[in-house]
A protein has these predicted regions:
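Divalent metal-coordination and catalytic microenvironments
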Residues: 25, 39, 61, 72, ...
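Active-site microenvironment of metallo-dependent hydrolases
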Residues: 2-32, 36-38, 42, 47, ...
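Active-site gating loops and adjacent loop-to-helix segments of metal-dependent hydrolytic enzymes
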Residues: 79-111, 118, 145-156, 219-244, ...
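Metal-coordinating catalytic core of metallo-dependent amide/deamination hydrolases
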Residues: 138-253
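His/Asp/Glu-enriched, well-ordered alpha-helical/loop segment
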Residues: 239-246, 288-372, 386-391
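Alpha-helical scaffold segments that flank or form the walls of functional sites
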Residues: 81-147, 167-176, 421-429
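Histidine/acidic-residue-rich catalytic or RNA/ligand-binding cores of hydrolases
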Residues: 219-231, 259-264, 281-290, 307-324, ...
C-alpha cells in the first residue's frame, strides 16, 4: 500500500508511533528483521514478531543498506537540466545560469525542488544540502515530500532581495527545527565581500547555523582571490572565521598543502563533487593529499545544470574512478571508503547520527533489489553499489523512520513532473 505524506505523519513519528518491521532483509550477508520506532532502528534480529499496528514490509530477496546523503547541490536547478552544456564556468554563469535564475519565482523553485527530490529519492538519497533561492519554497517542498534537508540561505553581497528573505527565515527559525533545517550559504569569495562574510560568521554563530560555501573550484577563483586579498580562498575564509567544525566547503579542487592543513585543523568538510568538476573542466579533487591529512570528506552531486543528474551512484563511481586514474593507483579510493563518504561520513556532515543500519542510529535506509542484472553476481554488495549499481535497484526508501518510496513509487510523482514542465515552459519556452 502506498501512503500519502499526511498518512506518514499518522503512521510514523508521532508519540504512539506503531513503527515499521522490515522482514527478511539481508544485512552483512545475514537474513534479519529490522524494527524501526520513532525514527530510529530499535531492534535487529532474526524472526521478530510484529507488534500491534506495526507496518510490516516484506523484504525477502532484498538487501538493507544505509541511505545516501548529498552534501552539495542546487535542487531547483533541475529545471535547467541540459539547458546550457559544454561551456566554461564563468561564461556558463554569466550568460546562461544567472539570466535564467532572474526569471524564477518562488513557485518555480518549489516545482524544481520537488522534481529534484523525486529524482534523489528514486536513487536512494534521504538528505540534501541546498544552496539556492527562495528558501521558504524549497523548504516547503522538502517538508511535503518527507526528506531531510538543510536549506541554504544563499547570500551574495549585491542581492538585497535574497538577503531580505534570509533575514525573514532567521526571524522564523523555529519553523526549521525538524528534519528540514536551514544553513548559511554565502556563495563564494568572488560574489561575497569581506563585510558580508563577517556578517555571515557572526549571524551563523548567533543562531547556531552551519555554513555551506563554494571553495577553490577554479584556478581563476584562486588567482583572483590572491590578487585581491593576498591569500588563497581557503586561507581568506580561514582568516574571516568561516572555517570551523563541519563547515561545508564545496569542490575544494585547487588547494595548496597549507590550505589542506587549514581545513583539517578547522574540522571543516571537503565536499567532493567529481562529476560537476569533470564536466566543467574545473580540475581534479586532490584526493590523496586530502586523505593523508585526515580531512573529513563527503560527496555531492551539484546542480542539474552542471552535473545533469542527482544520482549518488554516479557520484560514488566518479569519485572512485577519478582518484584511481588521476593518481595512477588502483588501490586508492576503495569502494568501502567511497561508500562511507556517501553514507556515514555524509550523515555526520549533515548533523545526523546515521549512515549505519544499527540499533540506535537514525532510521535512514534503502531496500535494494539484488535481482537487478547489474547487481548479479553479488560477491560484494558494497563494490556492486559503488561500481555497477543504478538507481533502478532501489526498491524502498525510508527516511527518519518514514517510508517515502515503496516499490519504486513516490506519492504524486506524475503531478510533480507535470508542474516542473509548466515552470520550464514559462521560463525557457521549451
Amino acid at each position: 500500500m502506498l501512503f500519502s505524506i499526511s498518512d506518514y505523519g499518522k503512521i510514523i513519528g508521532m508519540k504512539n508511533d506503531p513503527g515499521i518491521l522490515i522482514k527478511g532483509a539481508v544485512r552483512f550477508g545475514e537474513v534479519v528483521d529490522v524494527r524501526i520506532k520513532e525514527g530510529f532502528f530499535s531492534e535487529i534480529a532474526p524472526n521478530l514478531s510484529p507488534l500491534p499496528g506495526e507496518n510490516v514490509l516484506d523484504a525477502r530477496g532484498m538487501a538493507i543498506v544505509p541511505a545516501f546523503y548529498n552534501l552539495h547541490g542546487h535542487a531547483a536547478m533541475s529545471l535547467m537540466r541540459g539547458y546550457a552544456d559544454d561551456m566554461e564556468l564563468f561564461k556558463w554563469l554569466n550568460e546562461y545560469v544567472w539570466p535564467f535564475e532572474a526569471k524564477m519565482t518562488g513557485e518555480d523553485i518549489y516545482n524544481g525542488t520537488r522534481l529534484a527530490i523525486l529524482e534523489m529519492v528514486k536513487s536512494g538519497t534521504v538528505h540534501f544540502e541546498d544552496m539556492y533561492w527562495f528558501p521558504f519554497d524549497a523548504a516547503r517542498a522538502a517538508k511535503e515530500m518527507g526528506i531531510r534537508a538543510r536549506i541554504g540561505l544563499l547570500t551574495l553581497s549585491n542581492n538585497s532581495n535574497a538577503n531580505k528573505l534570509n533575514r525573514e527565515c532567521l526571524e522564523r527559525i523555529d519553523e526549521f527545527r525538524g528534519i528540514v533545517k536551514i544553513a548559511y550559504s554565502p556563495h563564494a569569495v568572488y560574489t561575497v565581500n569581506e563585510k558580508t562574510l563577517r556578517e555571515v560568521v557572526e549571524t551563523s554563530e548567533r543562531f547556531g547555523l552551519n555554513i555551506h560555501i563554494h571553495c577553490s573550484e577554479t584556478e581563476k577563483e584562486v588567482a583572483d582571490c590572491i590578487g585581491e586579498h593576498g591569500l588563497t580562498p581557503t586561507a581568506w575564509l580561514g582568516k574571516l572565521g568561516i572555517l570551523r567544525e563541519n563547515t561545508l566547503l564545496a569542490h575544494c579542487v585547487h588547494l595548496t598543502d597549507e590550505d589542506i592543513d587549514l581545513i583539517a585543523e578547522s574540522g571543516s568538510v571537503a565536499v567532493h563533487v567529481p562529476l560537476s568538476n569533470l564536466k566543467l573542466a574545473s580540475g581534479v579533487f586532490p584526493y590523496a593529499r586530502i586523505k593523508a591529512r585526515g580531512v573529513k570528506v563527503a560527496l555531492g552531486t551539484d546542480g542539474c545544470c552542471s552535473s545533469n543528474d542527482l544520482s549518488m551512484f554516479g557520484v560514488m563511481r566518479g569519485a572512485a574512478y577519478l582518484a584511481k586514474g588521476f593518481h595512477n593507483d588502483t588501490t586508492i579510493a576503495p569502494a568501502s571508503e567511497i561508500f562511507s563518504f556517501a553514507t556515514r561520513q555524509g550523515a555526520l556532515a549533515a548533523g545526523v547520527d546515521g549512515g549505519f543500519v544499527e540499533v540506535g542510529k537514525a532510521a535512514d535506509c534503502l531496500l535494494i533489489n539484488t535481482d537487478i542484472p547489474c547487481l548479479v553476481p553479488n560477491y560484494s554488495l558494497v563494490s556492486n553499489l559503488v561500481y555497477s549499481a543504478s538507481p533502478e535497484c532501489v526498491d524502498t526508501v525510508i527516511c527518519d523512520g518514514r517510508i517515502i518510496m515503496k516499490g519504486r513509487k513516490v506519492e504524486g510523482e506524475e503531478e510533480i513532473v507535470a508542474k516542473a514542465r509548466e515552470s520550464v515552459k514559462r521560463l525557457a519556452g521549451r
